[in-house]
């Protein structure tokens, strides 16, 4: 085997071991700063740390759903039901 072929074979075998600039995350930290993420979470649904949770802001005290958007029912004797749309389930309040 010629020297050139041997060098090409060695380079091809070592190519998977090489690291490139495109390996790993393009933006360190995932692209969304945690301060912005927590602020958006507080504005949408509140959290325990801010003291503005939906349960405290809901006048009836009855909420439906555990994932955003969480609904505030009109009355406390309502119950939650899930209805299926085309691609996902949506919580609704059913009041007798």
Curated annotation (Swiss-Prot):
Q: In which tissues is it expressed?
A: Expressed by the venom duct.
Q: What subcellular locations does the record give?
A: Secreted
Going by the UniProt record, its keywords in alphabetical order are:
Cleavage on pair of basic residues, Disulfide bond, Secreted, Signal, Toxin
Disulfide linkages recorded for this protein, renumbered to the chain, are none
| A Gene Ontology cellular-component term | extracellular region
Instruction: Say where the protein is mainly found.
Output: secreted
Q: Has keyword Disulfide bond?
A: yes
Q: How is it modified after translation?
A: Contains 4 disulfide bonds.
Source taxon at top rank: Eukaryota
GO MF annotation: an example: toxin activity
| Signal peptide region | 1-20
Propeptide positions: 21-57
Q: What is known of its domains?
A: The cysteine framework is XV (C-C-CC-C-C-C-C).
Return the similarity comment: Belongs to the conotoxin N superfamily.
What is the designated name of this protein?
A: Conotoxin Mr15.1
Its source organism is: Conus marmoreus (Marble cone)
Taxonomic classification, please?
Eukaryota, Metazoa, Spiralia, Lophotrochozoa, Mollusca
